[in-house]
Amino acid sequence: MVHLGPKKPQARKGSMADVPKELMDEIHQLEDMFTVDSETLRKVVKHFIDELNKGLTKKGGNIPMIPGWVMEFPTGKESGNYLAIDLGGTNLRVVLVKLSGNHTFDTTQSKYKLPHDMRTTKHQEELWSFIADSLKDFMVEQELLNTKDTLPLGFTFSYPASQNKINEGILQRWTKGFDIPNVEGHDVVPLLQNEISKRELPIEIVALINDTVGTLIASYYTDPETKMGVIFGTGVNGAFYDVVSDIEKLEGKLADDIPSNSPMAINCEYGSFDNEHLVLPRTKYDVAVDEQSPRPGQQAFEKMTSGYYLGELLRLVLLELNEKGLMLKDQDLSKLKQPYIMDTSYPARIEDDPFENLEDTDDIFQKDFGVKTTLPERKLIRRLCELIGTRAARLAVCGIAAICQKRGYKTGHIAADGSVYNKYPGFKEAAAKGLRDIYGWTGDASKDPITIVPAEDGSGAGAAVIAALSEKRIAEGKSLGIIGA
Protein backbone atom coordinates (compact mmCIF):
# COMPACT_ATOMS: atom_id res chain seq x y z
CA MET A 1 0.00 0.00 0.00
CA VAL A 2 1.31 3.44 -0.89
CA HIS A 3 1.70 5.67 2.17
CA LEU A 4 0.14 9.03 1.33
CA GLY A 5 1.01 10.79 4.60
CA PRO A 6 -1.47 12.35 7.01
CA LYS A 7 -4.92 13.22 5.76
CA LYS A 8 -5.55 16.89 5.13
CA PRO A 9 -7.73 18.48 7.82
CA GLN A 10 -11.34 18.85 6.73
CA ALA A 11 -12.05 22.27 5.24
CA ARG A 12 -13.78 24.36 7.88
CA LYS A 13 -15.79 26.65 5.69
CA GLY A 14 -19.11 25.24 4.68
CA SER A 15 -20.70 25.52 1.28
CA MET A 16 -21.83 28.90 0.04
CA ALA A 17 -25.00 27.31 -1.41
CA ASP A 18 -27.28 29.00 1.14
CA VAL A 19 -25.83 32.48 0.59
CA PRO A 20 -28.35 34.74 -1.24
CA LYS A 21 -27.31 36.00 -4.68
CA GLU A 22 -27.00 39.64 -3.57
CA LEU A 23 -24.51 38.64 -0.83
CA MET A 24 -22.66 36.30 -3.21
CA ASP A 25 -22.31 39.19 -5.66
CA GLU A 26 -20.76 41.27 -2.86
CA ILE A 27 -18.39 38.42 -1.95
CA HIS A 28 -17.23 38.22 -5.58
CA GLN A 29 -16.70 41.99 -5.68
CA LEU A 30 -14.70 41.88 -2.44
CA GLU A 31 -12.62 38.99 -3.83
CA ASP A 32 -11.81 41.08 -6.91
CA MET A 33 -10.94 44.07 -4.73
CA PHE A 34 -8.75 42.36 -2.13
CA THR A 35 -7.02 39.70 -4.26
CA VAL A 36 -3.49 40.68 -5.28
CA ASP A 37 -2.14 38.69 -8.24
CA SER A 38 1.50 37.74 -8.85
CA GLU A 39 2.02 40.42 -11.48
CA THR A 40 0.94 43.17 -9.05
CA LEU A 41 3.23 41.75 -6.35
CA ARG A 42 6.21 41.87 -8.73
CA LYS A 43 5.38 45.46 -9.66
CA VAL A 44 5.30 46.37 -5.95
CA VAL A 45 8.66 44.64 -5.38
CA LYS A 46 10.30 46.52 -8.27
CA HIS A 47 9.20 49.88 -6.85
CA PHE A 48 10.16 48.73 -3.34
CA ILE A 49 13.78 48.14 -4.46
CA ASP A 50 13.90 51.67 -5.92
CA GLU A 51 12.62 53.15 -2.65
CA LEU A 52 15.06 51.11 -0.51
CA ASN A 53 17.95 52.44 -2.61
CA LYS A 54 16.60 55.99 -2.48
CA GLY A 55 16.48 55.78 1.31
CA LEU A 56 20.25 55.22 1.39
CA THR A 57 21.06 58.37 -0.62
CA LYS A 58 21.94 61.77 0.84
CA LYS A 59 18.63 63.13 -0.39
CA GLY A 60 16.67 60.23 1.11
CA GLY A 61 13.16 59.05 0.30
CA ASN A 62 9.99 57.65 1.87
CA ILE A 63 11.80 54.77 3.60
CA PRO A 64 14.20 56.11 6.29
CA MET A 65 16.80 53.25 6.01
CA ILE A 66 18.41 54.01 9.38
CA PRO A 67 21.96 52.70 10.02
CA GLY A 68 21.84 50.47 13.13
CA TRP A 69 25.61 50.76 13.83
CA VAL A 70 26.06 47.00 14.08
CA MET A 71 29.09 46.60 11.83
CA GLU A 72 29.93 42.93 12.25
CA PHE A 73 28.12 39.67 11.73
CA PRO A 74 27.84 37.67 14.96
CA THR A 75 30.10 34.62 14.83
CA GLY A 76 27.95 32.61 17.23
CA LYS A 77 31.05 32.30 19.43
CA GLU A 78 30.30 35.43 21.46
CA SER A 79 29.98 34.41 25.12
CA GLY A 80 29.36 35.85 28.56
CA ASN A 81 26.59 37.40 30.64
CA TYR A 82 24.69 40.41 29.33
CA LEU A 83 21.69 42.39 30.44
CA ALA A 84 18.96 43.54 28.08
CA ILE A 85 16.02 45.82 28.75
CA ASP A 86 13.00 46.44 26.57
CA LEU A 87 10.82 49.45 27.33
CA GLY A 88 7.36 48.67 25.96
CA GLY A 89 4.12 50.57 26.22
CA THR A 90 2.92 48.78 29.38
CA ASN A 91 5.87 46.79 30.75
CA LEU A 92 9.60 47.01 31.21
CA ARG A 93 11.25 43.67 30.47
CA VAL A 94 14.63 42.95 32.05
CA VAL A 95 16.56 39.95 30.70
CA LEU A 96 19.78 38.25 31.76
CA VAL A 97 21.21 36.58 28.67
CA LYS A 98 23.95 33.98 28.93
CA LEU A 99 25.62 33.61 25.54
CA SER A 100 27.20 30.17 25.47
CA GLY A 101 29.56 30.73 22.51
CA ASN A 102 28.21 27.83 20.45
CA HIS A 103 25.27 29.55 18.68
CA THR A 104 23.03 29.04 21.74
CA PHE A 105 21.97 31.14 24.71
CA ASP A 106 19.89 30.98 27.89
CA THR A 107 17.68 33.77 29.19
CA THR A 108 16.14 34.62 32.55
CA GLN A 109 13.68 37.48 32.61
CA SER A 110 11.31 39.52 34.75
CA LYS A 111 8.62 42.01 33.75
CA TYR A 112 7.92 45.20 35.67
CA LYS A 113 4.57 46.90 35.07
CA LEU A 114 4.85 50.61 34.36
CA PRO A 115 2.85 52.64 36.89
CA HIS A 116 -0.35 53.90 35.24
CA ASP A 117 0.66 57.56 35.01
CA MET A 118 4.34 56.93 34.22
CA ARG A 119 3.88 57.43 30.48
CA THR A 120 2.69 60.99 30.98
CA THR A 121 4.69 62.03 34.05
CA LYS A 122 5.84 65.64 34.00
CA HIS A 123 9.23 64.66 35.47
CA GLN A 124 11.39 62.60 33.08
CA GLU A 125 13.67 61.50 35.98
CA GLU A 126 10.78 59.35 37.24
CA LEU A 127 10.95 57.11 34.15
CA TRP A 128 14.73 56.58 34.36
CA SER A 129 14.51 56.06 38.15
CA PHE A 130 11.82 53.42 37.64
CA ILE A 131 13.99 51.57 35.09
CA ALA A 132 17.10 51.79 37.32
CA ASP A 133 15.13 50.58 40.38
CA SER A 134 13.74 47.67 38.33
CA LEU A 135 17.30 46.80 37.24
CA LYS A 136 18.40 46.86 40.88
CA ASP A 137 15.50 44.57 41.91
CA PHE A 138 16.43 42.19 39.10
CA MET A 139 20.11 42.21 40.13
CA VAL A 140 19.11 41.34 43.71
CA GLU A 141 16.74 38.60 42.45
CA GLN A 142 19.50 37.05 40.30
CA GLU A 143 22.24 37.57 42.93
CA LEU A 144 24.25 39.76 40.57
CA LEU A 145 24.89 42.79 42.79
CA ASN A 146 28.30 41.61 43.97
CA THR A 147 29.57 40.72 40.52
CA LYS A 148 33.17 41.92 40.07
CA ASP A 149 32.85 42.78 36.40
CA THR A 150 30.62 45.47 34.95
CA LEU A 151 27.66 43.94 33.13
CA PRO A 152 27.20 45.31 29.59
CA LEU A 153 23.59 46.26 28.84
CA GLY A 154 21.72 46.42 25.53
CA PHE A 155 18.75 48.80 25.62
CA THR A 156 15.91 48.01 23.21
CA PHE A 157 14.27 51.37 22.61
CA SER A 158 11.52 51.00 20.02
CA TYR A 159 10.66 54.67 19.65
CA PRO A 160 11.79 56.91 16.78
CA ALA A 161 15.36 57.87 17.67
CA SER A 162 18.31 59.13 15.63
CA GLN A 163 21.64 57.45 16.20
CA ASN A 164 25.10 58.55 15.13
CA LYS A 165 26.69 55.65 17.02
CA ILE A 166 25.62 52.39 18.66
CA ASN A 167 25.56 53.68 22.25
CA GLU A 168 23.36 56.73 21.79
CA GLY A 169 19.78 57.43 20.81
CA ILE A 170 18.30 60.90 20.47
CA LEU A 171 14.53 60.61 20.86
CA GLN A 172 12.74 62.22 17.92
CA ARG A 173 9.21 61.82 19.26
CA TRP A 174 7.36 59.72 21.79
CA THR A 175 4.87 57.08 20.55
CA LYS A 176 2.82 54.26 22.21
CA GLY A 177 1.09 56.67 24.59
CA PHE A 178 4.26 58.17 26.09
CA ASP A 179 4.36 61.94 26.42
CA ILE A 180 7.09 62.90 28.89
CA PRO A 181 8.58 66.41 28.58
CA ASN A 182 12.30 67.19 28.22
CA VAL A 183 13.22 63.87 26.58
CA GLU A 184 12.53 64.54 22.88
CA GLY A 185 15.71 65.91 21.31
CA HIS A 186 17.87 64.36 24.04
CA ASP A 187 20.13 61.29 24.13
CA VAL A 188 18.33 58.75 26.35
CA VAL A 189 21.48 56.71 27.14
CA PRO A 190 23.12 59.18 29.60
CA LEU A 191 19.69 59.93 31.13
CA LEU A 192 19.35 56.27 32.14
CA GLN A 193 23.07 55.67 32.83
CA ASN A 194 23.01 58.58 35.29
CA GLU A 195 20.28 56.89 37.38
CA ILE A 196 22.09 53.53 37.18
CA SER A 197 25.32 55.16 38.41
CA LYS A 198 23.50 56.89 41.29
CA ARG A 199 22.55 53.43 42.55
CA GLU A 200 26.14 52.18 42.11
CA LEU A 201 24.95 49.28 39.95
CA PRO A 202 27.74 47.50 38.02
CA ILE A 203 26.05 48.13 34.65
CA GLU A 204 27.16 49.99 31.53
CA ILE A 205 24.82 50.71 28.61
CA VAL A 206 26.90 49.77 25.55
CA ALA A 207 24.19 49.61 22.85
CA LEU A 208 20.81 51.13 22.10
CA ILE A 209 18.92 49.06 19.57
CA ASN A 210 15.71 48.82 17.57
CA ASP A 211 13.75 45.59 18.06
CA THR A 212 13.77 44.68 14.35
CA VAL A 213 17.57 44.95 14.18
CA GLY A 214 17.64 42.84 17.37
CA THR A 215 15.51 40.19 15.65
CA LEU A 216 18.01 40.04 12.75
CA ILE A 217 21.06 39.77 15.05
CA ALA A 218 19.61 37.27 17.57
CA SER A 219 18.53 35.00 14.74
CA TYR A 220 21.88 35.33 12.94
CA TYR A 221 23.66 34.33 16.18
CA THR A 222 21.86 30.97 16.22
CA ASP A 223 21.50 30.57 12.43
CA PRO A 224 24.05 32.14 10.03
CA GLU A 225 21.65 31.49 7.12
CA THR A 226 19.55 34.43 8.42
CA LYS A 227 19.26 37.17 5.79
CA MET A 228 16.65 39.46 7.40
CA GLY A 229 14.75 40.15 10.58
CA VAL A 230 11.12 41.11 10.01
CA ILE A 231 8.24 42.13 12.25
CA PHE A 232 4.62 41.41 11.33
CA GLY A 233 2.70 42.85 14.27
CA THR A 234 1.00 46.09 15.22
CA GLY A 235 3.52 47.61 12.82
CA VAL A 236 5.59 46.14 9.98
CA ASN A 237 9.33 46.49 9.59
CA GLY A 238 12.45 44.80 8.26
CA ALA A 239 16.18 44.87 9.02
CA PHE A 240 19.10 43.47 7.03
CA TYR A 241 22.84 43.87 6.54
CA ASP A 242 23.85 46.26 3.77
CA VAL A 243 27.43 47.21 2.92
CA VAL A 244 28.88 50.63 3.86
CA SER A 245 29.89 51.44 0.26
CA ASP A 246 26.18 51.32 -0.75
CA ILE A 247 25.12 53.81 1.93
CA GLU A 248 25.69 57.13 0.16
CA LYS A 249 24.40 59.18 3.08
CA LEU A 250 27.35 58.01 5.23
CA GLU A 251 29.98 59.08 2.67
CA GLY A 252 32.78 61.06 4.32
CA LYS A 253 31.26 60.60 7.77
CA LEU A 254 33.03 57.43 8.89
CA ALA A 255 36.46 56.86 10.45
CA ASP A 256 39.12 54.85 8.59
CA ASP A 257 38.55 51.81 10.82
CA ILE A 258 35.12 51.35 9.20
CA PRO A 259 36.11 50.19 5.69
CA SER A 260 33.83 50.56 2.67
CA ASN A 261 33.26 46.79 2.54
CA SER A 262 32.10 46.69 6.18
CA PRO A 263 28.62 45.31 6.79
CA MET A 264 26.06 47.64 8.38
CA ALA A 265 22.75 46.59 9.89
CA ILE A 266 19.94 48.74 8.48
CA ASN A 267 16.63 49.38 10.22
CA CYS A 268 14.39 50.03 7.20
CA GLU A 269 11.23 51.40 8.88
CA TYR A 270 9.52 50.50 5.62
CA GLY A 271 5.95 51.00 6.85
CA SER A 272 6.22 54.29 4.94
CA PHE A 273 6.82 52.57 1.58
CA ASP A 274 4.80 54.05 -1.32
CA ASN A 275 3.41 57.07 0.53
CA GLU A 276 2.77 58.55 -2.95
CA HIS A 277 0.39 55.63 -3.67
CA LEU A 278 2.04 54.71 -6.97
CA VAL A 279 1.90 50.90 -6.82
CA LEU A 280 0.03 49.59 -3.78
CA PRO A 281 -3.39 48.22 -4.86
CA ARG A 282 -5.50 50.34 -2.51
CA THR A 283 -9.25 49.84 -2.22
CA LYS A 284 -11.74 52.56 -1.28
CA TYR A 285 -11.59 51.12 2.25
CA ASP A 286 -7.81 51.65 2.41
CA VAL A 287 -8.33 55.23 1.26
CA ALA A 288 -10.90 55.71 4.06
CA VAL A 289 -8.52 54.23 6.69
CA ASP A 290 -5.81 56.63 5.54
CA GLU A 291 -8.02 59.72 5.39
CA GLN A 292 -9.46 59.05 8.87
CA SER A 293 -6.04 58.34 10.44
CA PRO A 294 -4.11 60.88 12.57
CA ARG A 295 -1.49 61.18 9.80
CA PRO A 296 -3.09 60.91 6.35
CA GLY A 297 -0.65 60.20 3.53
CA GLN A 298 1.88 58.56 5.84
CA GLN A 299 2.71 54.89 6.56
CA ALA A 300 0.91 53.72 3.39
CA PHE A 301 2.41 50.20 3.43
CA GLU A 302 1.76 49.75 7.16
CA LYS A 303 -1.90 50.69 6.73
CA MET A 304 -2.40 47.76 4.32
CA THR A 305 -0.29 45.13 6.08
CA SER A 306 -0.03 45.69 9.83
CA GLY A 307 -2.22 44.20 12.50
CA TYR A 308 -3.30 47.59 13.74
CA TYR A 309 -5.50 48.17 10.67
CA LEU A 310 -6.89 44.71 9.73
CA GLY A 311 -9.90 44.89 12.07
CA GLU A 312 -10.63 48.46 11.02
CA LEU A 313 -10.79 47.42 7.34
CA LEU A 314 -13.24 44.66 8.28
CA ARG A 315 -15.41 47.15 10.22
CA LEU A 316 -15.53 49.66 7.35
CA VAL A 317 -16.62 47.02 4.81
CA LEU A 318 -19.36 45.69 7.11
CA LEU A 319 -20.73 49.19 7.73
CA GLU A 320 -20.86 49.90 4.00
CA LEU A 321 -22.69 46.64 3.30
CA ASN A 322 -25.17 47.59 6.03
CA GLU A 323 -25.66 51.04 4.46
CA LYS A 324 -26.44 49.29 1.16
CA GLY A 325 -29.17 47.37 3.02
CA LEU A 326 -27.46 44.02 2.42
CA MET A 327 -26.74 42.79 5.96
CA LEU A 328 -27.14 43.41 9.71
CA LYS A 329 -30.47 45.06 8.88
CA ASP A 330 -32.69 46.93 11.38
CA GLN A 331 -30.22 46.70 14.27
CA ASP A 332 -28.41 49.11 16.55
CA LEU A 333 -24.88 49.32 15.13
CA SER A 334 -23.70 52.11 17.44
CA LYS A 335 -20.88 49.95 18.85
CA LEU A 336 -19.72 48.88 15.39
CA LYS A 337 -19.63 52.53 14.37
CA GLN A 338 -16.79 53.27 16.80
CA PRO A 339 -13.47 53.57 14.91
CA TYR A 340 -10.93 50.86 15.79
CA ILE A 341 -13.42 49.02 18.05
CA MET A 342 -12.31 45.86 16.17
CA ASP A 343 -8.69 45.09 16.89
CA THR A 344 -6.88 42.33 14.99
CA SER A 345 -8.02 39.67 17.42
CA TYR A 346 -11.49 39.89 15.82
CA PRO A 347 -10.65 38.86 12.24
CA ALA A 348 -8.18 36.33 13.70
CA ARG A 349 -10.85 34.69 15.88
CA ILE A 350 -13.40 34.73 13.07
CA GLU A 351 -10.97 33.04 10.67
CA ASP A 352 -10.23 30.47 13.37
CA ASP A 353 -13.91 29.66 14.01
CA PRO A 354 -14.00 25.82 13.83
CA PHE A 355 -17.78 25.42 13.57
CA GLU A 356 -19.67 24.73 10.35
CA ASN A 357 -22.36 27.21 11.45
CA LEU A 358 -19.68 29.73 12.54
CA GLU A 359 -21.06 29.71 16.09
CA ASP A 360 -18.03 31.52 17.56
CA THR A 361 -18.51 34.36 15.08
CA ASP A 362 -22.17 34.58 16.08
CA ASP A 363 -21.11 34.85 19.77
CA ILE A 364 -18.52 37.54 19.03
CA PHE A 365 -21.01 39.80 17.25
CA GLN A 366 -23.76 39.29 19.84
CA LYS A 367 -21.61 39.65 22.97
CA ASP A 368 -19.19 42.36 21.87
CA PHE A 369 -21.28 44.44 19.47
CA GLY A 370 -24.90 43.61 20.34
CA VAL A 371 -25.55 42.53 16.75
CA LYS A 372 -27.30 39.38 15.50
CA THR A 373 -26.01 37.70 12.34
CA THR A 374 -27.48 35.15 9.95
CA LEU A 375 -25.38 32.20 8.76
CA PRO A 376 -25.01 33.63 5.20
CA GLU A 377 -23.85 36.94 6.74
CA ARG A 378 -21.30 35.08 8.88
CA LYS A 379 -20.03 33.28 5.79
CA LEU A 380 -19.48 36.62 4.08
CA ILE A 381 -17.74 38.00 7.19
CA ARG A 382 -15.49 34.93 7.39
CA ARG A 383 -14.56 35.17 3.69
CA LEU A 384 -13.83 38.88 4.12
CA CYS A 385 -11.47 38.14 7.04
CA GLU A 386 -9.64 35.59 4.88
CA LEU A 387 -9.31 38.12 2.07
CA ILE A 388 -7.99 40.91 4.33
CA GLY A 389 -5.50 38.63 6.13
CA THR A 390 -4.27 36.99 2.93
CA ARG A 391 -3.78 40.33 1.21
CA ALA A 392 -1.80 41.66 4.19
CA ALA A 393 0.50 38.61 4.11
CA ARG A 394 1.04 38.76 0.35
CA LEU A 395 1.86 42.47 0.37
CA ALA A 396 4.00 42.17 3.52
CA VAL A 397 6.42 39.75 1.82
CA CYS A 398 7.13 42.31 -0.94
CA GLY A 399 9.56 43.92 1.51
CA ILE A 400 11.34 40.58 1.91
CA ALA A 401 11.57 39.94 -1.84
CA ALA A 402 12.79 43.50 -2.47
CA ILE A 403 15.65 43.25 0.04
CA CYS A 404 16.64 39.76 -1.14
CA GLN A 405 16.74 40.98 -4.77
CA LYS A 406 18.56 44.20 -3.84
CA ARG A 407 21.26 42.22 -1.99
CA GLY A 408 21.37 39.37 -4.50
CA TYR A 409 20.26 36.72 -1.98
CA LYS A 410 19.17 33.54 -3.75
CA THR A 411 18.74 31.41 -0.60
CA GLY A 412 18.38 31.98 3.12
CA HIS A 413 16.12 32.31 6.12
CA ILE A 414 13.95 35.30 6.97
CA ALA A 415 13.52 35.51 10.76
CA ALA A 416 9.99 36.70 11.56
CA ASP A 417 8.35 37.84 14.76
CA GLY A 418 5.27 39.80 15.81
CA SER A 419 1.72 39.08 16.92
CA VAL A 420 0.27 38.78 13.41
CA TYR A 421 2.97 36.33 12.26
CA ASN A 422 2.69 34.26 15.44
CA LYS A 423 -1.07 34.27 15.99
CA TYR A 424 -3.05 35.21 12.87
CA PRO A 425 -4.54 32.05 11.29
CA GLY A 426 -3.18 31.26 7.83
CA PHE A 427 -0.78 34.23 7.79
CA LYS A 428 2.40 32.11 7.62
CA GLU A 429 1.01 30.00 4.78
CA ALA A 430 -0.24 33.04 2.84
CA ALA A 431 3.14 34.77 3.28
CA ALA A 432 5.03 31.71 1.99
CA LYS A 433 2.63 31.44 -0.97
CA GLY A 434 3.18 35.16 -1.69
CA LEU A 435 6.94 34.64 -1.94
CA ARG A 436 6.42 31.59 -4.18
CA ASP A 437 4.21 33.64 -6.50
CA ILE A 438 6.70 36.54 -6.68
CA TYR A 439 9.56 34.21 -7.56
CA GLY A 440 7.55 31.70 -9.60
CA TRP A 441 8.76 28.77 -7.50
CA THR A 442 6.95 25.48 -8.04
CA GLY A 443 7.21 22.04 -6.44
CA ASP A 444 7.57 21.16 -2.77
CA ALA A 445 7.13 24.33 -0.67
CA SER A 446 9.43 22.97 2.05
CA LYS A 447 12.28 23.21 -0.47
CA ASP A 448 11.73 26.92 -1.28
CA PRO A 449 15.15 28.63 -1.52
CA ILE A 450 14.08 31.52 0.75
CA THR A 451 11.91 30.61 3.72
CA ILE A 452 10.32 32.58 6.55
CA VAL A 453 11.15 31.06 9.94
CA PRO A 454 10.30 31.98 13.56
CA ALA A 455 12.80 34.52 14.91
CA GLU A 456 14.79 34.44 18.10
CA ASP A 457 14.00 36.99 20.82
CA GLY A 458 15.16 40.26 19.28
CA SER A 459 14.63 42.66 22.16
CA GLY A 460 16.26 40.30 24.69
CA ALA A 461 18.84 38.01 23.08
CA GLY A 462 19.33 40.39 20.14
CA ALA A 463 20.11 43.30 22.45
CA ALA A 464 22.58 41.07 24.31
CA VAL A 465 24.41 39.91 21.17
CA ILE A 466 24.64 43.52 19.96
CA ALA A 467 25.94 44.51 23.40
CA ALA A 468 28.62 41.80 23.04
CA LEU A 469 29.65 43.09 19.59
CA SER A 470 29.64 46.69 20.84
CA GLU A 471 31.65 45.83 23.96
CA LYS A 472 34.29 44.19 21.75
CA ARG A 473 34.56 47.30 19.54
CA ILE A 474 34.90 49.52 22.63
CA ALA A 475 37.64 47.23 24.05
CA GLU A 476 39.51 47.34 20.71
CA GLY A 477 39.28 51.14 20.59
CA LYS A 478 37.30 51.05 17.33
CA SER A 479 34.87 53.80 16.35
CA LEU A 480 31.21 53.16 17.11
CA GLY A 481 29.62 55.49 14.57
CA ILE A 482 29.98 58.82 12.79
CA ILE A 483 33.26 60.72 13.26
CA GLY A 484 33.05 62.96 16.31
CA ALA A 485 29.80 61.40 17.58
From Swiss-Prot:
Q: Which reaction does it catalyse?
A: a D-hexose + ATP = a D-hexose 6-phosphate + ADP + H(+); D-fructose + ATP = D-fructose 6-phosphate + ADP + H(+); D-glucose + ATP = D-glucose 6-phosphate + ADP + H(+)
Residues bearing the modification Phosphoserine? S245, S272
Kinase in keyword set: yes
Q: What does this protein do?
A: Catalyzes the phosphorylation of hexose, such as D-glucose and D-fructose, to hexose 6-phosphate (D-glucose 6-phosphate and D-fructose 6-phosphate, respectively). Mediates the initial step of glycolysis by catalyzing phosphorylation of D-glucose to D-glucose 6-phosphate.
Q: Where does substrate bind?
A: S158, T175, K176, N210, D211, N237, E269, E302
State the organism of origin: Saccharomyces cerevisiae (strain ATCC 204508 / S288c) (Baker's yeast)
Family per similarity comment:
Belongs to the hexokinase family.
The name of this protein is: Hexokinase-1
**Protein activity control:** Subject to allosteric control. Substrate inhibition by ATP.
Its pathway, per UniProt, is: Carbohydrate metabolism; hexose metabolism; Carbohydrate degradation; glycolysis; D-glyceraldehyde 3-phosphate and glycerone phosphate from D-glucose: step 1/4
GO cellular component terms, semicolon-separated = cytoplasm; cytosol; mitochondrion
Q: Which UniProt keywords apply?
A: Allosteric enzyme, ATP-binding, Glycolysis, Kinase, Nucleotide-binding, Phosphoprotein, Transferase
SUBUNIT field: Homodimer.
For whether the record's keyword set contains Oxidoreductase, the answer is no
Q: Which CDD domains match?
A: ASKHA_NBD_HK1-2_fungi (cd24087)
